[in-house]
Structure formats: C-alpha cells, structure tokens
A protein has these predicted regions:
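Short, polar loop motifs at secondary-structure junctions
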Residues: 46-51, 163, 244-248
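SAM-dependent nucleic-acid methyltransferase catalytic core
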Residues: 2-27, 35, 80-196, 200-211, ...
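Short loop/helix-cap segments at secondary-structure boundaries that form the rim of catalytic
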Residues: 52-58, 187-189, 250-256
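Short, well-ordered beta-strand micro-motif
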Residues: 127, 282-285
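An N-terminal domain-cap segment
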Residues: 15-49, 54-55
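Conserved S-adenosyl-L-methionine
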Residues: 39-96
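Conserved acidic-Pro-Pro-aromatic motif
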Residues: 192-282
Length: 286
C-alpha cells in the first residue's frame, strides 16, 4: 500500500496554523501523532485550524469545513499567497481599535461585503482573528463576526514565510479543499483511507457550549448521527480517530470502540476561569 503519511522529510517545512481556533489540536498532537496509521488518503472533515493536518502534511488529503470563511482562507493561501500577504501588511499598518471595528462591520452590509474579493475576505478574517479578544472566531445568529477588540500591543497579523510555505505545500500535495457538510467529505472514501474527526465537542455543561463558528449548532442529535457515520466507516474497513469531550454521553455512545482519555489544555475560552487542563477522549476503531 502506498503511504500518504507525510510529504517526505526533504520537502518538509514546519507549518503553523494560520488561524487560532477553539478546539485547536496543537495541545493534543503528541497523543494523536503516534496513533495515525499508514494510509493512502488522509481525510479531515472538520478541519478547523488544521493543526493536525499541517503537522502531518499528508501527500494526499481531503479537508473540509462547514465554515465558508475558513475554507476561503485556505483556498486563498493556496491560490493567492502574495496578494494575501500584501493585504495583511496593509491591515497591520492600520491596526487600531477604530480600524478593527471598521473592518469587523463590513459583514453588516451584505451588498458591500459581497463586493469583497476572496483574498480581501480571507485577509479580513485573519486580521480579525489575530486582533480580536482571545483569538475567538465567533459569529452571531446572523452569521456576523462579533468577537470584540483584543487590545494586543503587537499581534502577529502576518507571517509571510508561513503563508508561502503553506501555499507551497497545498499546491504540491494532492489536497482537495471542500466546504460543506462533513458527510459529503466522507463519501467515496475507500479502504486504506484514514479519517480524523474533530467535531464541535459535546458540551460538558449548559454554559460551556461554543458553536459560534457557524450560525448553526451541533447538538446531541448531531453527535448521534456522527457516531452512525463512524459505524459506516468501520463497516467499510476505513480507520478513524475521533476526538471529543470526556463525558458519560460520549463514552457510552462509542463504547464499542477503543477509548483513551487524554489531558488537553484549552487556551481559548470566552471565560478566563474556564481555561486550563481538562480531559478529552480519543476514540478509534483500530
């Protein structure tokens, strides 16, 4: 079997996620990395900030997310890295509280927002993500970015080397970038593929649920449907690894599979007192 495990040591350059993302997996990489089996295609249907994907750098991959703005960022990095860098440098020059709210308000006027080019939209999201409070990408029920100004003295708005390296990798690898329902990304996968699933987590309390990345939520019914999709992958002989909250509901739901509890530090939370170490689970069928 041909392995799509990595791009190869000679071509490999370390890549850092371009966006800060709630539930980002950088804290869990040391646990996830040794578990990833040999595979022909790597699939990540809830790619988010892509910490695992960019760490692994598979030769052949399918990445997907429901968030259109996020996927537009990856498409722009792949296709227009220099234009993106130029726009981010302009944002950096003008960065201030007043400017932040001016850029944030662009999506309040749909007609004007639709006039933005994909590169302008991508630069806007990266700029807001780097300068908003605690790095929260959050939208309201109308789909408008609503995280407040972060008051950072010297935010890292643009990393030119990282954007260029990420663009080179996305163009060199056989990576399909999709936007839509995660189930569509799973269709057509064959035995030999490997799927890493990092869905919106099951909330541990009524106040801890964070589904602000898209205006639609991901509740108990969606978690049950996700388990059904995992069962379908298992029947096809496709290996999967899933991360989720460490709670009775998830452990009972996946009781037929291998479950490992791992400690994870949550750096991003709207409430400072909720940040810190908390157990999560890694579920796998191999």
């Amino acid at each position: 079997m041909t392995s799509s495990h990595t791009t190869g040591a000679s071509a490999r350059q370390e890549l850092t996620p371009i966006l800060k993302w709630v539930g980002g997996k950088r804290q869990l990489l040391d646990f996830i990395r040794p578990l990833i089996p040999e595979h022909t295609t790597y699939c990540e249907p809830f790619v988010g900030g892509g910490a695992g994907f960019f760490d692994l750098q598979p030769k052949k991959a399918v990445i997907n997310d429901f968030n259109q703005e996020l996927i537009n960022v990856y498409q722009t990095v792949k296709e227009q890295p220099e234009e993106l860098i130029e726009l981010l440098l302009r944002h950096r020059e003008q960065n201030s509280q007043e400017y932040f709210y001016q850029i944030r308000a662009l999506d309040r006027e749909p007609e004007k927002y639709e006039e933005l080019t994909p590169a302008q939209r991508a630069a806007r999201i990266i700029y807001l993500n780097k300068t908003c409070y605690n790095g929260l990408f959050r939208v309201n029920s109308a789909g408008q970015f609503n995280a407040p100004w972060g008051r950072y003295k010297n935010p890292n708005i643009v990393s030119e080397d990282n954007i260029r390296a990420m663009s080179r990798y996305l163009n060199k690898s056989k990576t399909t970038i999709r936007c839509g329902d995660y189930r569509e990304a799973l269709k057509g996968l064959r035995k030999g593929a490997f799927v890493y699933l990092d869905p919106p987590y099951m909330p541990l309390s009524s106040s801890s649920s964070f589904t602000g990345y898209t205006a639609s939520g991901f509740g108990q019914a969606e978690q049950i449907e996700l388990k059904r999709q995992c069962d379908l992958l298992n029947k096809k002989g496709i290996k999967f690894l899933l991360s989720n909250s460490c709670c009775d509901f998830i452990e009972d739901l996946y009781s037929g599979y291998q479950i490992e509890r791992v400690p994870a530090k949550r750096a991003i939370n709207a409430r400072a007192d909720r940040r810190g170490a908390i157990d999560e689970v890694l579920v796998r069928n191999f």
